[in-house]
Amino acid sequence: GLGLIGGSMAKSIKNRTAHTVWGADLNSETMTMARMCGAIDAPLTEENLPQAELILVAIRPGAAIEWVRQHAPLISKSAILVDLCGVKRTVVASIAPVAEQYGFAYIGGHPMAGRERGGFTASTEDLYVGASMILTPDKRTDMRLLETLKAFFLDLGFAGLTFSTPEEHDRIIAFTSQLAHIVSSAYVKSPEAQRRRGFSAGSFQDMTRVARLDEDMWTELFLDDEDFLTKELDELIGHLTDY
């Protein structure tokens, strides 16, 4: 995927390393832009996929799981696959057995960076500078794999790696990311939002920066993390009631 996350990965890799980048996106216009600006060297195809040494899957959780299942037979046993999805329990539980079956290395990941806009046109080569890269290794993860990924992500400008279980990731992300988007989106639904001109400043801008959501993507993320997110919503409602 070459949206905000995948596109920024591609641009960062091309600008900060000597690696060859192959990319794929369902949007033909995105593919054209990616090639024209040099974010990718060539399209990722079934012909060159077996040669890929590191595969970054930057699409929605359900689509990521399906893509790996469909393409697993083509992935080299010496390759490393990292998903970049915003939830980890469902993704890791689905992809890890496939990776084990076909013999390639897999680890769940989540770059802690983003913008209020999505898509390739919003992607930048410096999106990950100073950010944290979350990885979810398990007891079978080879330490040499972690060292390889650490060097790779530091080259892209990440400040460091954060290690977590899928469960811990989803529990904390429900608070630090998902809840924040819900609060921002709910906040701007007040009728007064239409009458704010001349009455708003920095605090309003801060509260509303991430109010516009990609409905399909965020619905999937919210539903995959329903238990932890519901708990955080209940906690917030309780504190609002206190006020």
Language model segments and positions:
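Internal alpha-helical scaffold of NAD(P)-dependent oxidoreductase catalytic cores
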Residues: 125-212
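Conserved short alpha-helix immediately C-terminal to the canonical SAM/SAH-binding motif I
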Residues: 29-30, 63, 88-91
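Rossmann-like NAD(P)(H) cofactor-binding subdomain of soluble oxidoreductases
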Residues: 69-121
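Rossmann-like NAD(P)-binding element
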Residues: 46-82, 86
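NAD(P)+-binding Rossmann beta1-loop-alpha1 motif at the extreme N-terminus of oxidoreductases
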Residues: 1-46, 50, 54
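Interdomain hinge/lid region at the active-site interface
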Residues: 195-243
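Short, well-ordered alpha-helix to beta-strand connector turns
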Residues: 40, 52, 78, 130-131
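Residues at the starts of beta-strands that form the adenosine-phosphate
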Residues: 20, 105, 132
